[in-house]
Amino acid sequence: MAEVQPTRMELIKLRRRIKMATRGHALLKMKRDGLIMEFRQLLEEAKEVIGGMVQKYEKAQSKLALAIAVDGIVAVRSIALSCCQIPPEFSMKRKNIMGVVVPVIKREPIRKKPTERGYGILSTSTRVDEAVEAYEELVDAVLEVAEIETTLRKLIEEIERTKRRVNALEYRVIPTMEELAKFISFKLEEMDRENIIRLKKLKMKKAKS
């Protein structure tokens, strides 16, 4: 504080900075609260989506077990390799949530017609078709979960960053500037008192002379 020039101009500048910091603090708190609300809403959605994915996984496993029992493990493995030759098609886009850029997976329909799956439908049972269909649904659910989990992670990172900025302004930056403003005000008042005393002494000297 000793290095600060206790001038009225410095005090005016400092008060402007305090005003700006206070406004910034309020805006950041609004952003933090908005992000937390978005996070909570998405978290509820994520619970449902993950629950659905788990159900689809269990269904796919059950259908796979039936397909193996009917067609045999060798045939099912061969069909699985054929299906893997045609990977799912999707593209990545982005959207903005309160300043946070998050991914959006634009998915093409995962479920294909039996003739588009890369294996001979005449040489397999309907159990295989049901298993393949169940896994197609599972892949779609996995992509949806991946999108939501990535968005949640990015939101929580931004919430933590915003919290740190809010706390820095609230507990360090603004209090420090306010203390500095008090110090300058005190010094200016002290200088004013000294000037008044000096003027009184000068008047007294002139009156005596």
From Swiss-Prot:
A GO cellular component entry from the record: plasma membrane
Compartment list: Cell membrane
Mode of membrane association: Peripheral membrane protein
Superkingdom of source: Archaea
InterPro entries for the chain: V_ATPase_D
GO-annotated molecular function: ATP binding; proton-transporting ATP synthase activity, rotational mechanism; proton-transporting ATPase activity, rotational mechanism
Any single GO BP term: proton motive force-driven plasma membrane ATP synthesis
One Pfam family recorded for the sequence: ATP-synt_D
UniProt keyword terms in alphabetical order: ATP synthesis, Cell membrane, Hydrogen ion transport, Ion transport, Membrane, Transport
PANTHER family linked to this entry: V-TYPE ATP SYNTHASE SUBUNIT D
Subunit structure: Has multiple subunits with at least A(3), B(3), C, D, E, F, H, I and proteolipid K(x).
HAMAP family: ATP_synth_D_arch (MF_00271)
Family named by the database record: Belongs to the V-ATPase D subunit family.
Biological role stated in the UniProt entry: Component of the A-type ATP synthase that produces ATP from ADP in the presence of a proton gradient across the membrane.
Protein name in the entry: A-type ATP synthase subunit D
Organism, scientific name: Archaeoglobus fulgidus (strain ATCC 49558 / DSM 4304 / JCM 9628 / NBRC 100126 / VC-16)
